[in-house]
Amino acid sequence: MKIGIIGASGKAGNEILKEAKKRGHEVTAIVRNASKVQEQDVAILEKDVFELTAEDIKPFDAVVNAFGAAPGQEHLHVEAGRALISILKDAKHTRLLVVGGAGSLFVDEAKTTRLMDTPEFPKEYLPTASNQGENLKDLQQTDSISWTFLSPAAFFDPAGKRTGSYQKGKDNVIVNAKGDSYISYADYAIAVLDELEHPEHKNERFTVVSEAE
């Protein structure tokens, strides 16, 4: 597959890039600053997400949105998401997979309370969580593109090990055998590539959890 990764120089984006390369896919890092791409032997499209056009993304079978917003700029998650929705309408054969957040996952079966609505949710993560949640809403109201939104577990561990396995859920927080909502970046990247290779969640959100080792 031809896969473009927006934000490939970030932690999550880099893990997804490595996993895609490991599986033999043709990967392009879509970044604002080419010098920040850590991997060697990867094609680079040096362009801001807001400058991307339908022509830029038409060559890809899938585009992964691992866009990272700086503190105080969290609203850019929504704006970047809308920019991508707009250009994807003219790139019908390119699928979008969004690296989402856990904050918009529900904690009750009735789906009335989200993780970010609970008193335990760290206040410093609220701006990111709420804006990523808004991005999900925009996608859910769009029927003219092919998208998937992948929410990590509550503890999204950049230093965690690659166990090679994970469990899936839909819109609710799920936990592992120890009762923890946990996934490493490496196992999350596996889930991303599995979904791109064998799509099971077209135009919906799903979530993943794994064991911490």
From Swiss-Prot:
Stretches assigned to coiled coil: none
InterPro entries for the chain: NAD(P)-bd_dom, NAD(P)-bd_dom_sf, Polyketide_Oxido-like
Gene Ontology molecular function: any one: oxidoreductase activity, acting on the CH-NH group of donors, NAD or NADP as acceptor
Residues making up the signal peptide according to the UniProt record: none
SUPFAM superfamilies: NAD(P)-binding Rossmann-fold domains (SSF51735)
Annotated protein name in UniProt: Uncharacterized protein YwnB
Species of provenance: Bacillus subtilis (strain 168)
